[in-house]
A protein has these predicted regions:
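Eukaryotic helix-grip
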Residues: 1-192
Length: 192
């Protein structure tokens, strides 16, 4: 995996980007990314994840995520609007943007006021996929910059390492036969 951080003009917190090549078909990677409820199994410090409107489908949908705080920092949460599209070159792009009006502020957490992230899934051949994660956010509340930047540096590496392990599970590796009906339907919308 290749990892990059960058300064964002006007912000103290760095943006990050992680790039890896997975020994898995793009269908499997996409099925994993679309399985919102399973995100805590592979996304660094994700405590819980759920769809806010499961009937909306995966082209445009809303999620609620809770990210575990590192002591002594409180947990963070964010409601996001996500969309998925296929580019002319075949890459599939899943984009998420924080939307404060999707869900009232919860007492459990500090609300993340700004977050933008993109997953780009690109089939290299039948058994290999390039996966690119880019994220820029503001963690909200009072948070020491060194903690925020430490998490920003660890998140892409640890998340991509966990994706590499998780995508081997039958629900994703064999999405067409052992995956959920929802996962099969979702990946079936795209050309690989």
């Amino acid at each position: 995996s290749d990892l990059y951080t960058a300064r964002v003009p006007g912000q103290e917190l760095r943006a990050f980007r992680g790039v890896t090549v997975l020994p898995a078909p793009a269908r499997s990677v996409l099925a994993l990314l679309a399985d919102v409820e399973n995100m805590p199994s592979w996304f660094f410090h994700m405590k819980s994840a759920r769809e806010l409107d499961p009937s909306a489908g995966h082209y445009g949908h809303n999620h609620y995520l809770v990210i575990a705080g590192i002591w002594p920092v409180r947990d963070r949460d964010v409601a996001i609007r996500a969309s998925t599209s296929q580019q002319a070159d075949g890459a599939i792009v899943m984009s998420s943007v924080a939307q404060a009006n999707l869900l009232a502020v919860q007492s459990c957490c500090v609300r993340i006021p700004r977050m933008e992230s993109t997953w780009t899934v690109r089939a290299l051949d039948a058994g290999h996929t390039e996966l690119v994660l880019t994220t820029s956010s503001h963690p909200g509340g009072s948070l020491p910059l060194w903690i925020a930047n430490m998490v920003a540096a660890d998140m892409p590496r640890k998340t991509l390492e966990a994706v590499r392990r998780e995508v081997k599970k039958p629900a994703y590796a064999e999405v067409d036969t052992q995956g959920s009906a929802k996962g099969r339907e979702f990946v079936g919308r795209f050309k690989f």
